[in-house]
Amino acid sequence: MFDHLDRPEFVALRAAVLRFVDEELRPIERELRLDSEAVWPRDVLRRVWRRSSELGYYTASLPVALGGQGLSIVETCALKADLAASGAALAPHVLGELGGPPRVGNMLKYATPVQLERYFKPVMRGEKSTCFALTEPHSGSDALSIRTSAVEDGDMLVINGTKHYISGAPFADFAIVMCVTDPGATPPQITAVLVDLDLPGVTVEHEYVPMSGQHIDADIRFDNVRVPRENVFGGVGNGFKLGMSRINVNRLLHCPTMLGLAMSAYRASLDYARSRRQFGGPIARFQAIQHMLADMAAALWACESMIAHTASLADAGADLRMAAAACKLFVSERCFEVADKAVQIHGNVGVTRGHPVEQTFRKLRMFRILTGTSEIQRNTIAKAILEPAGTEREA
């Protein structure tokens, strides 16, 4: 995947990251019997974060000025695809996908010097983890309908409300919480606030597990939680703008993970088709199997090409609203189809609980919901292609 990326330093980095997975992460997984559906001990995650940070991988996607390697977005996509395709349970933590630098990288410009030192630099060093808390029980795609409130009380803000399905919350140290600070405004004034999750009144609840089986989501409840006003992130009333500033690139950066997962299912299907024997020979000789493999290969090539082009647009500073939505829509649906064909090729093995292909099928089904459903992506695309040039609309 992404074989056209031939910058020598990046080629060496890709190889080094995969060696790290094979030589350091897989032994940890074997020793502790960790798979993607295990409850990951926080001390183990911190070891991985810190070690990845020491090696320069954890912050690789950040600018050099912030201690990163200044990877382009297309290079970051290639690394993410490699890690997802590796099948390692701890692979998402190499780049800090679930609470590390990628969660905050494009928002660091909004941080005050104090916030950088107290919250974000520890994230970059692998010492702290964060999560982005927007979704609520009654507020999914309709982000402006959130009800979590932050009310001024002298130099403090008092926060009340509930956040739902927050990715990375089970192992986060603090959250970037979207709060209503002026419910009377039209639309409601939304402000981002940095909230330590060990404060009195904060409860992180793990009452559900998504169909992927991964313990990576939780609800966060705030009951009269007091935080200093200096924890306002990005300015009062700028929360929605801040959230939208990350959404397009965030949608794009989910796509290489889908691609890597689908690629792993495709590779497994190739191996299985060559080794599984029926009626006197390998099932790969049957045209029905060949056609499924051909469709999978074509879909993966199309997805990789679309991701690479969209990432190149992002690197050039282009407006990604339509492109990122189209990419997320297309890649999520095609990669799920690849996983479905992989299950079909594997037969009864493919529907056995815990088989890698079965796990990949469940993971990829979720991506048609996460970070904006397929229907929301279609809405965004339709708005972009139907509105007059220059019209400003949110994603």
Question: Positions of the model-derived regions?
Answer:
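N-terminal glycine-rich flavin-associated loop
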Residues: 91-114, 140
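Flexible, small-/acidic-enriched active-site or ligand-binding loops
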Residues: 145, 198-228
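Alpha-helical interface subdomain recognition
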Residues: 1-89, 110-115, 122-127, 152-157, ...
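A short core secondary-structure module
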Residues: 156, 160-205
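A short, Trp-centered hydrophobic/proline-enriched beta-strand micro-motif
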Residues: 126-134
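Short glycine/proline-enriched turns and hinge-like loops at secondary-structure junctions
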Residues: 71-73, 142-144, 168-173, 186-189, ...
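Conserved hydrophobic/aromatic beta-strand scaffold that supports enzyme active sites
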Residues: 131, 147-149, 174-178, 192-194, ...
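Short beta-alpha junctions and helix-cap segments that line functional grooves
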Residues: 119, 146, 162-164, 205-208
